[in-house]
Amino acid sequence: MLQHVVDGESELAKFNAETKKKYANFPEIVREDAHVYKDTDGYYVVKEEWQKPSNAFEKLKLAKDAMKTVIALNEIKTLGEKSGSTKEDFEKFEKELGDGDEIDHRLKWAGLFHRRKGHYGRFMMRLKLPGGLVSSEQMKYLASLVQSYGDDGCADITTRQNIQMRGIQLKDAHDIMINLERLNMCSLQSGLDNARNATGSPIAGIDPLEIIDTRPFTDKIQEYVTGGGRGNPEIANLGRKWNVCVVGSSDYFEHPELNDLAFVPAKSETTGEMGFNVLVGGFISSARAAEAIPLDA
């Protein structure tokens, strides 16, 4: 990701055009009555007539595009250099910054979640591990990183086959991201209004009853969502907790009915060719749940 950072806003349009070119075979369909338009840099923006009334998160995005500043212009490095090592340093840094949204919200586009109430000045970093796959080399690095923070460091395995690390200091974030990229991992677009970790079969490739191996498909989804680790503005302004999965067997380990977008393997009745049935609109939270419905496409 960080090796692709641009030098200034004048290069953003070119930067995003290169990303889009990689996916030129993906049709871009925007309805005439859509509430958004694409600006000159390639980022989707809510049309003025739909900006009021708006919820707090939408107002935050309208004020400053997180993908544009935090990711493409590498604001993480700049913020990290100013944030210091101690709680007192961080308090001074935040006071001088004068923008709590930058710390508490926009950094989530880079997978950094400030623990303001429970652990001020420390961050939880959520990765993106498509299908939950992690090598021994990758895990050793993650373990050493958590260990380096002593009693402040710990890690979680999430319900979406992912890993998130706690106790991270902002001053270290840039170097951590470089190491993640070196090891073919990233934390990009893992929080707030982005597609969450693409899940697949937990026993993909070794399940004797699997219909398809989900690993190549979750990898492709990861590649698209993150723009190959450089950020993809085409899919960086969604609703919160947007979930996608690929089903590998009839056991439905992936709970496709509870995902926003789910691909379920199916064989064509006419050609015998393998493909997918597509489900959309699944949702679950402590407040409500909705079952995904088939597109029949």
Predicted regions: what is each one?
Residues 284-297:
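Internal alpha/beta scaffold segment
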Residues 76-79, 100:
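Extended, compositionally biased low-complexity polar/Lys-Gly-rich tracts
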Residues 2-32, 38-39, 43-49, 59, ...:
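Small-residue-enriched alpha-helical segments and adjacent helix-cap loops
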Residues 269-283:
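Short, well-ordered strand-loop elements centered on a beta-strand within folded domains, enriched
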Residues 81-91, 108-110, 130:
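Helix-rich interaction surfaces within compact, conserved domain-sized segments
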